[in-house]
């Protein structure tokens, strides 16, 4: 599994037996701007994709990528919430090859699977729920700090963050070798952001990809998190939503 342009890299080298997963067409779908850049795939789309990957009922699925497990985390989150036993290979392809393990080239094809996914909204946060969460829980904005502060916005129409959201970049959970930082460091970072066991917490990013990685990091330390999948790309394209700028959660709030 890789970023949308990763198929060529996959064809050159991948873990033996691995099947390529397309982030844009199988782990997301195209929609209106008001839905965000990476709307969730329909249940039918995800199930058809999982069967194409060769997933059968009862299988353990392992997802990996070569970008800090960010895209793999999206697959993990989607499959986990639909009843699949799924794991993420820590460190991905880079760690695999760095430790001398074999790779193969070419297209990997698996026999059609028969998995039946559970239809579920577990773990997903709507735009209204995201707006309300800071009043009684923690909403994490996992984008880089300049985007959170509203100093720059390279993709979406408005810069800033959801009022009340706390900034904790997803990249801070990834070590230099592409593996997840250790559990003690994760717990300390989340605790500093006000997240401990029992906290209602959700994450958002630009379009719902990096936020899934934060949900994975939270699960690593035993904390269940929701993902606001529409994320900033939906919020900033929705008229009337207030926008906060600056380095604090409530910052300078402006009308949307």
Which role fits each region the language model picked out?
Residues 1-256:
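Cytosolic catalytic domains that perform sulfur/thiol-centered chemistry
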């Amino acid at each position: 599994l890789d970023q949308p342009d990763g198929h060529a890299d996959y064809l050159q080298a991948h873990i033996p037996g691995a099947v390529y997963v397309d982030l844009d067409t199988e782990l997301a779908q195209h929609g209106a701007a008001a839905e965000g850049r990476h709307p969730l795939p329909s249940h039918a789309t995800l199930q058809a994709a999982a069967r194409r990957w060769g997933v059968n009922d009862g299988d353990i699925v392992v997802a990996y990528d070569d970008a800090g497990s960010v895209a793999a985390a999206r697959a993990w989150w989607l499959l986990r919430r639909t009843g699949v036993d799924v794991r993420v290979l820590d460190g991905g392809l880079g760690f695999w090859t760095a430790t001398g393990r074999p790779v193969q080239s070419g297209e990997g094809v698996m026999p059609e699977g028969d998995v039946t996914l559970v239809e579920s909204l577990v773990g997903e946060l709507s735009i209204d729920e995201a707006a309300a969460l800071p009043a009684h829980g923690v909403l994490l904005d996992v984008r880089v700090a300049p985007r959170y502060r509203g100093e720059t916005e390279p993709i979406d129409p408005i810069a800033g963050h959801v009022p009340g959201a706390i900034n904790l970049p997803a990249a801070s959970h990834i070590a230099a070798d592409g593996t997840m930082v250790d559990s003690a460091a994760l717990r300390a970072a989340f605790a500093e952001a006000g997240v401990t066991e029992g906290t209602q917490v959700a994450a958002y990013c630009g379009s719902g990809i990096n936020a899934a990685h934060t949900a994975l990091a939270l699960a690593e330390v035993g904390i269940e998190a929701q993902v606001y999948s529409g994320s900033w790309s939906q919020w900033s394209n929705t008229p009337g939503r207030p926008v906060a700028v600056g380095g604090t959660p409530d910052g300078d709030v402006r009308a949307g």
